[in-house]
Amino acid sequence: MAKEVGKDRLGDFYTNGKVRKRREWRGFADTMYDYWRWLHIMGILAGFIMKPRNIKAMLRYRWMANYLAVPMMLDRHTQGLRGEYLRICHTEQDLVVSDVAKLLNNLFRGDRRIGNDTEFSKKVVLVDENEMTAVMMGFPTLKGLSRETPSTYVSVLLNQNAAVHYIDVAQEYGLAGDVCPMPEAEAGVSIDDDAPVLGACAIQCNTTCDGSLMSNGVISKRLELEDGIPVFQLAAPLRHREADVQEYAAQEIRNAIAFIEEHTGEKWDWDYYFECAKRVNISTRYRMDWLDMNKTDYPQVFGSNLALYTETNYMAICGKIPEFVEADRKIDALAQKAYRAKKKMAKEYRHRAIIWGVQSHFYFDFLLWLVNCWGIVPLTDMLSMVSTKTLCEDNTPEGREQAIYDIAWLTENMIMRNRTHGGYKVLLDELWEYVEEFHADMVILWEHMSCKALNGMHGQFEEKAREKGIHLVWVTHDLFDPRVISRQGVRDQINRYMRAVMQEEPLDPSLEILHDEHSW
């Protein structure tokens, strides 16, 4: 048990079961802080489950059982962290946990099977999990809620096996088994009648791939034909960097806004939109500052601390919740303090890596494992390299027209889609630009075996890596399905490369092989 960074054998905390042996001792101050935040999380969970309708939902929906693992997920993402890094993680993750609890509460409030609050349901617009919620930035009286976010996306972060049942259900009904398991699981939830039913209407987007379009087709038909909920298909252009598609993209946003107004009776509020736009710009400036910091010898906000928070704040929040700007300020203050003191997250930094490709969702804390086990610093990842465009903040006729194009740009540049669509420049060329900017000596390239967009460029990635003399490590996975390649299977691909090619020994040998196949 150690206060100093890197003194503990973190692998010794693991068991063959679902939870670890004990909590980590981080020194008195950090241990008390971590325990206080653990109590805070337990308070959120207790407040959630005290409502009778949420107890009913726990018994009705299979995927709700995964939320018992919320504290364990936080523990996985704080392994080995001390000082400012521990506080950055809790500032981000605890806010995300609170936001997901509110999302669940709202879903069950309007759900016809659970709360059946019909008046509230009339103010709900259902949105895709993989969709930018920018189209809701001008509706202060409406709730843009995603059913897929808690049922599949967050569930797999909590429990690596959460989506397995729904993947199997989708395939039992004839859906192809070689498509991305994320939309397949989402379709399985709908087929299994395991999604809350509520809302005045729904907005679906053509993200992020053909598998998503397949899933949207299954889900939208059930919404329209069985539940009587009209669905708008927002078709964002694929060539999103081209100027000649932006007018079409803007018209799609106008059509989506008109659709929402028609089915909810609410009108777009420009004052509220520009409030949200200002908050988006604030968050963007902070994110750019953190990325600039990561280009130095003392990166501060990286790995899971960057990836999970960016996904939530950028795509799901879109400036609609002021608490996220407050969190940005706290995170930045902590990062600046650690940077001035030249602090490091681990006892040794050996390699600077760019993480590219579609992240293994059932093993998101892999980014922290890289630092703790091998001293590989994940400076940034593909899903965090999203739009840094400043949105127009002028509430004038000209500013309002520009705002429509800004919303369209955000929709085109949602996380993952902004790289898997748009041509080889955004996926291939910009990777090597980032390698130079961040002074990286290594690229860890996720090879999501069901993602055709990235797999088709395998050879081009290798050719460029050889040309530039960069270590390129392929890590194969199947996103939501740990049965195909397990967490240890993911780790082994790094272990083999580091030992055979780099001729290195791990910083913490206890982390090299973990028996976590049954772990949440």
Predicted regions, residues:
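Gly/Ser/Thr-rich loops at beta-strand to alpha-helix junctions
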Residues: 125-134, 206-214, 356-363, 449-456
